[in-house]
Structure formats: structure tokens, C-alpha cells
């Protein structure tokens, strides 16, 4: 402390007031004097003058009080920068007001300029300042930490309030959103119910309308069917002025379906337009309203539950009915009712000529998915074509007329008109009923037939009845000729007279003159159309009706009856012996080639 006092000069500062400003008379330090250790006094003007006496103690105490007070004030404002040295500098630089004392009388002398400060009292001041400064610092530090803690608590409290306010606001927004969603859902549900009610009413109206239309259509079909039956007895004159309505390709290839008597068209999977729209809208609503995975799974399960199983379980089999048939306590009506419970099959294909299969089928088996055409364990044989053995080529003319929409000419049955010499054999058998004077009676066989061999050497030992029977089975020569027959030469024309008598010729001439003139059949005469017909018929394995329909698609200007007559006239169907299929073949191949040569058409590749 004393060293600092030696090194600090006294500076002149007239603007700042010192700690001794409470004295009345103030003097400004004009000289820069230093504090000396030997005298321990502050010399201002006259170094010889000094102050002593009891007033020095008073001045010292008052000075220390002022210094302590000023230091305390400065510590409150700037606690980090205040220290003992600064206080001394403040004390040094402040203007000093002094009072001069008389040495001898020890009285105060006005306007004095010497102040004496004892070294002992001055040396005790820095320690108290340091302690005061450290205590102030600690107190200030505690106050600072306390304020910091208070600020942190205040901040935490505000944060909690803010979060609570935010949660309340979010809860309010969520409640508002749920309320709006519930209101929207109620509106959609109400709208859906109204839409379903509207669709249901519309569907009922549509069903009633379709029912009325179906009744009207059935009445019209029955009326047209009756008119067509009546119209078949009369020949309708063709009107050349009637405009021909050309059909589109779709109408030519896809003919309208005609339900026969006893046939009902199934509409199990048929939905009206209104029902289809309602079903689609229902599924769309389920998909749109499902927000979580659970709803989606429920929808998938619902769709799978709507899938119908394949096939139907057979409740009663034909074997069970057959086992109950020998029982005597069952009546015919009961057996018929049991038989009606067995499922029946009606199988018909477009290409087949023979009637469709109608019967029971109760075999229970499952086809393998990797080989659905397998016939193992089924008893089926797809290689066998039962249609080949069917020879009857009669067609249902009524159905064909209804499908084609044209009124065809009535086909005359050529087989009803006896041909020339057709009944000669029957007349001969009647005339020659007695062979060798013995009646020819039909033999009746009772029991199974046993094959036997009869040699010619034993012919005389047979009975007369067996002789007559074997006489009918003997071989006869058709053409009597001498020597071998050369197959590479033309046979000679025989000039033998006709076996038929003149009376037979006269009777035939008379019968022809009496019979009415035979009606000529309508056939195709255009060479180009004939060539197109022959190309489609040659080597075809279809029946006559199917070939006629196929040819009519290529020749729509002719009706079915005309095409059928032309096919019968120019083509014949092979017998199909063995494994060979029955094919249509043109009778006169040379005529076919001549037509092709005249038309300059290339030969089709077979």
C-alpha cells in the first residue's frame, strides 16, 4: 500500500470533486508532490508546515468514512472493477480542502494547506477494504445466482404454461375435427340410404318393365310360331319390289338365340344396369371408408365369401335308385320321384348331328389342375366320335327358319316318290311267292342262333325247308362272260333284250302320264357361286346342316334350302368305314375342273 502511494502522482483535476468536498474552503492541487515515507504526510504548498494535534484524528476519521462510503457505492455499481487501489486513486485525484492549524496553540488556522495523516491509521484501511470487497463479491455472486435461478424457474413455469395451452388448443382442434368427421359421415350415410332407396325403387320399376316386355315377347313369339306353321302350308309369292335389307357381318356370324320348347335361359348371373351400378357403388364405399388395415381385411374376407363354390354336391346317385328298384314295396310313382332327384345332363354340341345326350350323371371325381384333359378314372374316350355312326341327316327346319329370319321353301321329300323300278323286286316276290310250288314263309327263330356249316355234298340230305332257305343264299353270276375279265378294256355293250315285258313298259308309261309334273328344286346355277360352294364342301367332315350354314355365310344371297338342294345334287358323303371320317366329295370332279377353267380360278390346295 505504501509503495503504491509513493508511485502515484497527484494530478490536477478541476472537473471532478474529491472526497473532502464537504469542507467550505477548497483548494486545487497545483503542484505534483509525492507522498514520502519519512514524514508520512501529504505536502501541498509549504513542506515546512505540518498539522498536529487532536484535529488530525478527526480529519482522519471523517476521511475514512467518506472513502468507505464512496467505495461501497462504487462496489454496488461496478463490483468487479472496484478495489483498494482505485479507491486510493479516487482519494488522491479528488480536490483537497484543508484547514491550517497553529503548531503552538494547536488551533485551527483558516485557509491552511497541510493535512497530516498518521502511518498507522493509514495502513489499516486496505485490509478492511479487501474484506469488504470479497464479501461484496460473494454477496453479489449469490444474488446473481439467485436471480439466475429465479429466471430459470420463471422460464420453466412459462414453458409449462405454454405447453398446457398448446395441448388445450390441439385437443380443441381434434374435437372439432372429429365432430366435423362425424357430421360428414352422418351426411354420407343419409345420402347412401337415400341413394339405395332410389336405386331399389328404380330396380323394381326396371324388373316390372322387363317382366312386361318378356310377356309381350313370349306372346309375339307364340303368335309368330303359329303363323309360321300355318304359312308352311301355303306358298308365298316372292315380291321382287321388296327392298333387300343387308345384314352386318356381326348379324351374319352371330345369329340370335332361339329357346326351344322346354328350354329356359338361365339369368342367374345377369344383373340389370341399376343393380350393377348399386353393387359397384357399395364396394367403392367400403374401399373409401376403410382407413385401417382391419377394415381392409374385413373387405377381403367379404369378397372371398361372395365367391361361389365350383360344382354342386350330388345328394343322390343313380346307383342308390337302382338298388331300391327291386324292392316290391316301392311303387312306380315313388321310383319316378327318386329318379327325378338324380341330376340329369343335357349335352349338345354345335357340330353334332345326332340328338343330344340326355341322362343321369352322378360320378364324383376331380380333374387334376396340371392335366385337365386327363381321362384317367373317368371312363371318357375323346378319340371316339359317336357322331360318325349317325346317318340321319334330317334337320329341324322350323328352328333354322327362325334363326335365319327367312321364309324358306318347303322341301319336298324325294324318298316318298317311288323311283323307276323301285318296287319291282317286291312285285316279283309277290308274284313268285311260291318257289317250286312251295310257299315261302318267314322263319321265326326262338332262342340264340348257332352258326353251322353245311357242305354241298350233304345238300341232298337236308330237309325241304332248309333247301329252300339255302337256295335263297346261293351265289349267282351277274354278268355271264367267257374267259377272264380284263380290267383295262372297256366292257362290250350287250344287245340283249330287256327282261321287262311290253305290258310293264305300257304300265310305266301310263303311270307317268297320270302322275302330275314333278316340281323342280331351286338350286344355284351361277358358276362363280358354284365354285365357292364346291370349295367349302369338298373334304368337309361336318353334317349337312352345318355345311349349309357355313356355305350360307359365304353366299348370303341364297337361302338354306337352295344351298342344301345344290349340295345334295353335286356332292355325296362317304360312308367313313374304319377309322376314316365321313367326308363330303364332289360327284363329278371333271365338271368342277371345267367350271374352274372357264372362270380362270386357281385350283385350291388341299
From Swiss-Prot:
<dbReference type="GO" id="GO:0000786">
    <property type="term" value="C:nucleosome"/>
</dbReference>
<dbReference type="GO" id="GO:0006281">
    <property type="term" value="P:DNA repair"/>
</dbReference>
<feature type="compositionally biased region" description="Polar residues">
    <location>
        <begin position="493"/>
        <end position="515"/>
    </location>
</feature>
<feature type="compositionally biased region" description="Basic and acidic residues">
    <location>
        <begin position="128"/>
        <end position="212"/>
    </location>
</feature>
<feature type="modified residue" description="Phosphothreonine">
    <location>
        <position position="509"/>
    </location>
</feature>
<keyword id="KW-0539">Nucleus</keyword>
<feature type="region of interest" description="Disordered">
    <location>
        <begin position="483"/>
        <end position="520"/>
    </location>
</feature>
<dbReference type="InterPro" id="IPR022043">
    <property type="entry name" value="CAF1A_DD"/>
</dbReference>
<dbReference type="Pfam" id="PF21796">
    <property type="entry name" value="Cac1_C"/>
</dbReference>
<dbReference type="GO" id="GO:0033186">
    <property type="term" value="C:CAF-1 complex"/>
</dbReference>
<dbReference type="GO" id="GO:0006335">
    <property type="term" value="P:DNA replication-dependent chromatin assembly"/>
</dbReference>
<feature type="modified residue" description="Phosphoserine">
    <location>
        <position position="94"/>
    </location>
</feature>
<dbReference type="Pfam" id="PF11600">
    <property type="entry name" value="CAF1A_acidic"/>
</dbReference>
<comment type="function">
    <text>Acts as a component of the histone chaperone complex chromatin assembly factor 1 (CAF-1), which assembles histone octamers onto DNA during replication and repair. CAF-1 performs the first step of the nucleosome assembly process, bringing newly synthesized histones H3 and H4 to replicating DNA; histones H2A/H2B can bind to this chromatin precursor subsequent to DNA replication to complete the histone octamer. Plays a role in the maintenance of heterochromatin.</text>
</comment>
<dbReference type="Pfam" id="PF12253">
    <property type="entry name" value="CAF1A_dimeriz"/>
</dbReference>
<keyword id="KW-0227">DNA damage</keyword>
<comment type="subunit">
    <text>Component of chromatin assembly factor 1 (CAF-1), composed of MSI1/p50, CAC2/p60 and RLF2/CAC1/p90. Interacts with SAS2.</text>
</comment>
<dbReference type="GO" id="GO:0005634">
    <property type="term" value="C:nucleus"/>
</dbReference>
<keyword id="KW-0597">Phosphoprotein</keyword>
<keyword id="KW-0143">Chaperone</keyword>
<dbReference type="InterPro" id="IPR021644">
    <property type="entry name" value="CAF-1_p150_acidic"/>
</dbReference>
<dbReference type="GO" id="GO:0000785">
    <property type="term" value="C:chromatin"/>
</dbReference>
<feature type="region of interest" description="Disordered">
    <location>
        <begin position="116"/>
        <end position="212"/>
    </location>
</feature>
<dbReference type="GO" id="GO:0006334">
    <property type="term" value="P:nucleosome assembly"/>
</dbReference>
<feature type="region of interest" description="Disordered">
    <location>
        <begin position="393"/>
        <end position="438"/>
    </location>
</feature>
<comment type="similarity">
    <text>Belongs to the RLF2 family.</text>
</comment>
<feature type="coiled-coil region">
    <location>
        <begin position="128"/>
        <end position="240"/>
    </location>
</feature>
<feature type="compositionally biased region" description="Acidic residues">
    <location>
        <begin position="393"/>
        <end position="434"/>
    </location>
</feature>
<keyword id="KW-0156">Chromatin regulator</keyword>
<protein>
    <recommendedName>
        <fullName>Chromatin assembly factor 1 subunit A</fullName>
    </recommendedName>
</protein>
<dbReference type="InterPro" id="IPR048800">
    <property type="entry name" value="Cac1-like_C"/>
</dbReference>
<keyword id="KW-0234">DNA repair</keyword>
<dbReference type="GO" id="GO:0000775">
    <property type="term" value="C:chromosome, centromeric region"/>
</dbReference>
<feature type="modified residue" description="Phosphothreonine">
    <location>
        <position position="78"/>
    </location>
</feature>
<keyword id="KW-0175">Coiled coil</keyword>
<dbReference type="GO" id="GO:0006260">
    <property type="term" value="P:DNA replication"/>
</dbReference>
<dbReference type="GO" id="GO:0006325">
    <property type="term" value="P:chromatin organization"/>
</dbReference>
<keyword id="KW-0235">DNA replication</keyword>
Amino acid at each position: 500500500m505504501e509503495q503504491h502511494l509513493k508511485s502515484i502522482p497527484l494530478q490536477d483535476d478541476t472537473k471532478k470533486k474529491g472526497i473532502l468536498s464537504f469542507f467550505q474552503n477548497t483548494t486545487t492541487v497545483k503542484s505534483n508532490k509525492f507522498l514520502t515515507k519519512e514524514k508520512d504526510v501529504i505536502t501541498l504548498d509549504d513542506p515546512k508546515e505540518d498539522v498536529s494535534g487532536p484535529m488530525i484524528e478527526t480529519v482522519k476519521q471523517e476521511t475514512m468514512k467518506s472513502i468507505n462510503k464512496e467505495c461501497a457505492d462504487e462496489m454496488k455499481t461496478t463490483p468487479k472493477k472496484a478495489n483498494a487501489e482505485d479507491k486510493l486513486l479516487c482519494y488522491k485525484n479528488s480536490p483537497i480542502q484543508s484547514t491550517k492549524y497553529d503548531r503552538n496553540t494547536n488551533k485551527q488556522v483558516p485557509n491552511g494547506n497541510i493535512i497530516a495523516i498518521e502511518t498507522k491509521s493509514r495502513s489499516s484501511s486496505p485490509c478492511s477494504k479487501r474484506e469488504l470487497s470479497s464479501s461484496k463479491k460473494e454477496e453479489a455472486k449469490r444474488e446473481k445466482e439467485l436471480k439466475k435461478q429465479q429466471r430459470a424457474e420463471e422460464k420453466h413455469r412459462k414453458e409449462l404454461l405454454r405447453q398446457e395451452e398448446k395441448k388445450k388448443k390441439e385437443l380443441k382442434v381434434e374435437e372439432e375435427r372429429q365432430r366435423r368427421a362425424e357430421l360428414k359421415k352422418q351426411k354420407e350415410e343419409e345420402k347412401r340410404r337415400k341413394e339405395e332407396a332410389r336405386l331399389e325403387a328404380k330396380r323394381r320399376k326396371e324388373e316390372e318393365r322387363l317382366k312386361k316386355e318378356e310377356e309381350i315377347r313370349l306372346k309375339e313369339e307364340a303368335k309368330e310360331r303359329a303363323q309360321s306353321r300355318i304359312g308352311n302350308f301355303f306358298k308365298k309369292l316372292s315380291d321382287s319390289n321388296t327392298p333387300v335389307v343387308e345384314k352386318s357381318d356381326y348379324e351374319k356370324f352371330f345369329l340370335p338365340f332361339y329357346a326351344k320348347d322346354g328350354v329356359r335361359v338361365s339369368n342367374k348371373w345377369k344383373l340389370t344396369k341399376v343393380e350393377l351400378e348399386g353393387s359397384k357403388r357399395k364396394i367403392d364405399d367400403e374401399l373409401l371408408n376403410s382407413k385401417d388395415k382391419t377394415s381392409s381385411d374385413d373387405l377381403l374376407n367379404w369378397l372371398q365369401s361372395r365367391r361361389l363354390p365350383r360344382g354342386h354336391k350330388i345328394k343322390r346317385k343313380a346307383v342308390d335308385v337302382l338298388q331300391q328298384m327291386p324292392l316290391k314295396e316301392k311303387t312306380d310313382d315313388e321310383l319316378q320321384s327318386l329318379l327325378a332327384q338324380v341330376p340329369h345332363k343335357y349335352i349338345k354340341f354345335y357340330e353334332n348331328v345326332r340328338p343330344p345326350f340326355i341322362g343321369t350323371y352322378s360320378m364324383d371325381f376331380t380333374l387334376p389342375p396340371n392335366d385337365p384333359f386327363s381321362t384317367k378314372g373317368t371312363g371318357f374316350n375323346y378319340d371316339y366320335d359317336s357322331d360318325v355312326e349317325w346317318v340321319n341327316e334330317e334337320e329341324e327346319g322350323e328352328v333354322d327358319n327362325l334363326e335365319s329370319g327367312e321364309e324358306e321353301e318347303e322341301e319336298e321329300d324325294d324318298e316318298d316318290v317311288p323311283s323307276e323300278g323301285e318296287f319291282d323286286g317286291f312285285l316279283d316276290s309277290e308274284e313268285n311267292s311260291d318257289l317250286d310250288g312251295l310257299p315261302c314263309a318267314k322263319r321265326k327263330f326262338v332262342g340264340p342262333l348257332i352258326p353251322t356249316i353245311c357242305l354241298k355234298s350233304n345238300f341232298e340230305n337236308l330237309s325241304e325247308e332248309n333247301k329252300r332257305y339255302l337256295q335263297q343264299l346261293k351265289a349267282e353270276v351277274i354278268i355271264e362272260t367267257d374267259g377272264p375279265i380284263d380290267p383295262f378294256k372297256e366292257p362290250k355293250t350287250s344287245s340283249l333284250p330287256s327282261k321287262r315285258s311290253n305290258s310293264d313298259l305300257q304300265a310305266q308309261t301310263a303311270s307317268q302320264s297320270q302322275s302330275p309334273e314333278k316340281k323342280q328344286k331351286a338350286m344355284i346355277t351361277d358358276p362363280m357361286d358354284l365354285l365357292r360352294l364346291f370349295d367349302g364342301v369338298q373334304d368337309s367332315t361336318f353334317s349337312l346342316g352345318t355345311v349349309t350354314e357355313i356355305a350360307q355365310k359365304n353366299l348370303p344371297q341364297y337361302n338354306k334350302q337352295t344351298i342344301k338342294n345344290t349340295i345334295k345334287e353335286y356332292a355325296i358323303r362317304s360312308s367313313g368305314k374304319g377309322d376314316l371320317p365321313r367326308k363330303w366329295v364332289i360327284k363329278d370332279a371333271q365338271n368342277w375342273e371345267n367350271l374352274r377353267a372357264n372362270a380362270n380360278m386357281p385350283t385350291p390346295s388341299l
